[in-house]
A protein has these predicted regions:
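Extracellular glycan-modifying ectodomains
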Residues: 1-172
Length: 172
């Protein structure tokens, strides 16, 4: 609880608080959803995550909540060693949505509780990294430049896909 109070104090002093979780690790007890198909159905964790986010939001002047980032099935630097079409085939948007259902449900509930709050925004990285069918872990198939440093952290190139939205929120 002490760390929440520290976050709260820092958030009160900041123009903008950006909050991002490793939802897969917290809700599923696993670093990457590709490594475990079994979800932890722990309702208390979901409730606690919702309460923590709302607590930090209530301390913040303005807040951006970053949704779950699609996990890459491979460590970013190794992407050049695999067949790109195989990687793309194993990373559907449907798979991402299924594995992140709990986190997306929590974010949806938070969004519903804040729909009239102009100082609260949600950025869903999958909207920038996925099309209607699949999520991309490379810039394009002709230029296999990875969008990730590892399995869950975006590289500079990957981050550029969402940082413009964050910058526009800073300017509002």
């Amino acid at each position: 609880k002490a760390y929440l109070n520290q976050i709260c104090e820092l958030s009160k002093k900041s123009k903008l608080t950006i909050l991002s979780y490793r939802y897969t690790k917290y809700l599923n007890n696993n670093l990457n959803y590709f490594y475990n198909s079994k979800l932890d159905e722990n309702e208390s964790k979901k409730k606690m995550l919702f309460q923590r986010i709302m607590h930090i939001k209530n301390c913040s002047n303005k807040m951006v909540l970053i949704g779950p980032v699609p996990d890459s099935p491979v460590w970013g630097p190794n992407i050049h060693r695999i067949n790109v079409s195989d990687l793309m085939a194993n990373s559907t948007l449907e798979f991402f949505m299924d594995k992140n259902k709990d986190a997306l449900d929590i974010i949806s509930k938070i969004k519903a509780n804040n729909k009239h709050n102009n100082n609260f925004h949600i950025i869903q990285p999958y909207e920038y990294l996925c099309n209607k069918k699949k999520c991309s872990f490379i810039l394009d198939e002709k230029t296999p430049i990875t969008l990730y440093y590892d399995d869950n952290h975006l590289s500079n190139i990957g981050s550029k896909k969402i940082v413009e939205e964050i910058n526009s929120l800073l300017m509002r």
